[in-house]
Amino acid sequence: MRDLLSKKSHRQLELLELLFENKRWFHISELAELLHCTERSVKDDLSHVRSSFPDLIFHSSTNGIRIINTDDSDIEMVYHHFFKHSTHFSILEFIFFNEGCDADSICKEFYISSSSLYRIIRHINKIIKKQYCFEISLNPVRITGNEIDIRYFFAQYFSEKYYFLEWPFEDFSQEPLSQLLEFVYKATSFPMNLSTHRMLKLLLVTNLYRIKFGHFMEVEKNSFNNQLLESFMQAEGIDEIVASFDSEYHISLNKEVIGQLFVSYFQKMFFIDEEVFLNHAKTDSYVKKSYQLLGDLVDQVSREYNLQVDNRDNLIWHLHNTAHLHRQELSTEFILFDQKGNTIKNFQNIFPRFVSEVKEGMEHYLEALDMDPSSMKVNHLTYTFITHSKHLVLNLLQNQSKLKVLVMSNFDQYHAKSVAETLSYYCSNNFELEVWGELELSLDALKESPYDIIISNFIIPPIENKRLIYSNNVNTVALISLLNAMMFIRLDE
């Protein structure tokens, strides 16, 4: 979807991502090579992003250029900027909110000619069709196609373009939606939290706009849980919610509308309750296969990495639901900001082999169930595995061998012991700190020693497979921070 940006904006976004992700100096020539453009273009882009993002701190020197993160700046604001200043995305948003308007009103809103509008729409449709099954038409102005794709795309768009606390939906205030969702949580005992609550509000308000313009999803009778819908419509307190929707939104919250709002959660392969899922895993052949495949993966990973997965069935339940909510919950695919992909990448930097094996397992699971094993779907399932496995990170860290650290001083043994004791207190328990106890010291002795990290206040020549820290260069606080960071850099990987 980044191709909906202009070529210049696309390149500037990639430039900022490079500078944010890599905390180092870049020469202009290197950036030009990475971005496949001229050095002149890089210089122009740097000038533009500096003026566009005054809160970002750029450092320039003979070493090149780098960006310095501050406490109140984050790459998230970069994506908001490019969404906001993109004509293509702005036109898409305008059409979503104003479906049924005439093409002239779009031209007047964006100060463009009719021919320019038609050219832009052709380009938008060309890009969208590469990934989604819907298109924009201008006679009349409508968004038509696969309703799941339409609803997902725009809900994801709103989640990426607007900040967490923003609510850009003038036609639908938040309160009735929140009341409906709180009613659902109570009626179904569905586990809820802040981020999931916001996600559901965005999905529901997107659905409301589509319903407002007369677009309903086709639901296969065999895949829809009518029994759950019926019990929901008869739950105590539903009449007050219906009245609220009627007075605030002028929408009749009947059975059909409720079904359209929560269509993803009334499908038979989604289970609101964990116990219901586990019971179906005993009687339904498809659910049983899904449970067994995921269970085999969890058990395999647990054995290989010596993990104690206390919430095995709960994890399998979440993974099954995640697999069957593709494009029906946010961040299963991204438009500009691959936030979950970045989260997985950060985790993979620490545990590369573990993440790779989980990804392979998820790909096998999807293929075995005849589901599309796209990289985005695999990533989303991997994210769910990592975040929903109880104490996973703690167990992986505890199971890693401790790094052996040698502390030496040319002052005396007491200084070395003092440094070692300080580091032992403030650093994690993933280190074994010792001081040199022999009378003689040689480079060969250090090479043959079992230590992974050597800290000294005197210079030692580089040693292969040893990390050397010259303590005169850093204060104690920086030394603690540096050593803690090193536990994530395994010497054998």
Feature locations, PLM:
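A cross-family "folded-core" feature that marks the main globular domain of proteins
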Residues: 1-493
